[in-house]
Design a protein with these regions (language model features):
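C-terminal motif of bacterial Sec signal peptides marking the signal peptidase cleavage site
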Residues: 12-14
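Disulfide-braced loops of extracellular cysteine-rich modules
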Residues: 41-53
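Accessible peptide chain termini
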Residues: 1, 29-31, 219
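Secreted, propeptide-processed cysteine-rich mini-domains
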Residues: 23-44
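Sec-dependent signal peptide recognition
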Residues: 1-9
Length: 559
């Protein structure tokens, strides 16, 4: 299962390292344990007791018996967390002021605030990559407003869209956007009274002075939108397959229906499929839960042409090389990693390389940004090890290192020399621990892992690590600690220097909700839950902290 760690762009954008709602573990109704205060769910199965797994609702549920080898329960599935790199404006933080029908723009260098009128009750905001502009959706009337800073003012362009859309994806080049309705997001936010189209999307051309919006029909119930690296095509992953939109053509011609390309047998539940489009946009890799067969389907020049690759056991995770030339398939049961060159090895599977991982940690794989390193771990069971595999070297050498706590999720630094491990927490209050190891297991925390030596620095935290982001050069990590809304709750940002491992804890005035980077202003920022609005900025060089409060009321806006 893939879970996306993205900043909550319905509130603030600039933006990076987003997260799921916090509060992990399990409670009495499911696992038979009394829950700790503030510890009422789970995000991975290694936070559950043996014999339980973390279900789709974040609760530990007893596994069925007799379904695995020797009548033992089948090991629970891996959960994949995708940590998106900061999709930041170069200099500004944007905040949707829903009640005022305005978008606030905060200058990370000067803390000056500018408000701009946009559509009705704006919530969804995204920045345009490589620029200081942003796009914001209204919640009622079906409009998107493109906002661009022009000196001390903002230029705006209002475009008509379909109504009640709640997702906004912008291609990596910043030239096009796809706006659509995500039912899963609406359910999560408790907003099912405002349901949008299950088959229509709005495509927006973002060229300054030549903006245009076009409505198109795609496959049933879009689940995700992906783009090729060139930003020429969007791939709408639906229940029926993949609808491929030529973005330039779509915005220059009369709107048409974009039927989906089937990527699996229609009898297979879409919930059992993971579909990833390679960066070239020519092929899609398809993993099916509990199936030892991978499919590689053409979604480019020969749509629908498909090939199958047989694995030693079902893939628990697949990852794509950044250049689109390789697929990596992790096989937990067989303790193997298959290296599939695309499309050659799919067309002739005899070329597939299989790496033996008998002595490694197997389950999930996270790649470095350059694709040269992979970090393997599992969050299905309590395994206190990680394995580094060098994917650019002959024989794929690997190293397995012990760590102090099992792992929930992994993010590799932009520089590729460290990784941040978000550690799993076992049930129970650390204050009741009987041994030091028991105390560590029952505590929240994260680990900075040096990928050259395997040395890990464990940082125990008073609350679950929340949103986080690396500095662009990988020299620092910013981790938010959100203990809730109680006046005495923990509310802080931790600054971790990767060269020394030293952590500074900076107290915040309000609970943090998201963390990101403004590269043009050399600032990290922390958005906070505050009735008037609050954002703190931390200098990337000297760690100086500044805060702006009160931009969510007209009387406090600096115009």
């Amino acid at each position: 299962m893939r879970l996306l760690y993205l900043a909550p762009m319905f509130a603030l954008v600039a933006c990076g390292g987003d997260q799921l709602d916090d509060g992990y573990g399990y409670g009495a109704p499911d696992a038979g344990y009394s829950s700790d205060a503030g510890f009422v769910g789970c995000l991975s199965s290694n936070e559950c007791a043996p014999g339980y797994y973390c279900n789709d609702f974040g609760r530990c549920e007893k596994q069925a018996t007799g379904s695995g080898d020797g009548g033992m329960p089948t090991p629970p599935p891996e959960k994949e967390y995708e940590f998106a790199p900061p999709t930041s404006s170069q200099r500004f933080v944007y905040v949707a002021m829903t009640a005022q029908d305005e978008l606030a723009r905060i200058d990370g260098a000067t803390l000056a605030v500018k408000s701009t009128k946009v559509g009705k009750s704006p919530k969804v905001v995204a920045t345009i990559p490589g620029t200081d502009g942003a796009v914001v959706l209204d919640s009622f009337n079906g409009t998107a407003t493109v906002v661009r800073p022009v000196g001390d003012t903002d230029s705006t362009r209002v475009l008509g869209t379909l109504q009640r859309l709640n997702r906004l994806d912008i291609d990596p080049t910043g030239r096009f956007a796809v706006i659509w309705f995500d039912l899963a997001k609406a359910i999560k936010e408790g907003n099912t009274f405002s349901v949008g189209s299950f088959q229509d999307v709005t495509v927006v051309r973002l060229a300054a002075g030549n903006e245009k919006a076009v409505n198109l029909t795609v496959g049933f119930r879009p689940r995700e939108v992906q783009f090729d690296a060139a930003g020429n095509r969007a791939y709408v992953i639906t229940q029926d397959g993949v609808s491929v939109i030529d973005l330039g053509y779509a915005t220059d011609h009369t709107a048409t229906i974009i039927p989906p390309i089937a990527v699996a047998d229609p009898s297979i539940s879409p919930d059992d499929l993971e579909v990833d489009v390679v960066s070239t946009g020519e092929w899609a890799a398809v993993r099916q839960t509990n199936s030892a067969t991978l499919r590689v389907v053409n979604v480019g020049s020969s749509p629908g042409t498909a090939y199958s690759v047989t694995l030693a056991s079902p893939a628990t995770d697949i990852d794509l090389a950044p250049n689109g030339a390789r697929l990596y398939a992790v096989q937990r049961a067989a303790k193997k990693l298959s290296v599939v060159d695309i499309p050659g090895d799919a067309q002739n599977p005899s070329g597939v390389e299989t790496i033996d991982l008998t002595n490694a940690t197997v389950g999930s794989l996270t790649l470095s940004l350059d694709g040269k390193r992979g970090l393997m771990f599992t969050n299905a069971t309590s395994d206190e090890r990680v394995t580094l595999i060098k994917l650019d070297q002959p024989g794929y050498p690997q190293s397995t290192w012990p760590i102090k706590k099992s792992v929930r999720a992994v993010a590799v630094s932009p520089s590729g020399d460290t990784a941040l491990l978000i550690n799993a927490k076992m049930a129970g209050d650390p204050a009741t621990a009987s041994t030091f190891d028991d105390f560590v297991d029952k505590s929240y925390g994260y680990t900075l892992l040096d990928l050259a030596s395997g040395f890990g620095k464990l940082q125990i935290t008073p609350v679950d690590p929340g949103a986080f982001t690396y500095a662009p050069d990988g020299t620092k990590v910013y981790v938010a600690l959100d203990g809730g809304d109680a006046p005495t709750a923990t509310r802080a940002i931790q600054v971790l220097t990767t060269q020394t491992g030293v952590v500074q804890t900076k107290t915040l005035g309000s609970p943090p909700s998201s963390v990101g980077i403004l590269p043009g202003a050399a600032q990290a920022f922390v958005n906070q839950r505050h009735p008037l609005g609050r954002v703190s900025f931390v200098d990337l060089i000297n760690d100086a902290q500044r805060t702006v409060t009160g931009f969510d009321l007209n009387s406090h806006i600096v115009n």
